[in-house]
């Protein structure tokens, strides 16, 4: 759903550019093109690229993105994922108040399309109204030594939901973040 959401977001912003006023957006439809093509979480070698960042990975996709993240020093990162084990929308705030303050409106906006995952434990982490404060090591993120640290959010949709609803939820979530 992430690539579809990226395309819909860009189409939406082309029609209403004022919604991104003051932002320089870099949109990556996927970080795992071979996994996307195969319909798998892992890449062509079966490796979950979203556990490889900032851990000395030899995977070319990870190396290239790490180089770009260092060069560009983004002020914010929004990762869009579909989770095949969740019961609804949720997100990762990485233990930072700024991230949580951006994630909650994104979840509310996304909730117009899909239900919230309100379980107290999601993906093995404690959750509060769909917000998880900690995350797996190796996920796509800014360089660990980047200062000031950018906001960094992961927005998850239920993979079992129709792709169009996931994409709509993701787009509205990103637009909510941009409006904050």
For each feature predicted by the language model, list its residue ranges.
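Structured catalytic-domain cores with a bias toward divalent-metal coordination
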Residues: 1-180
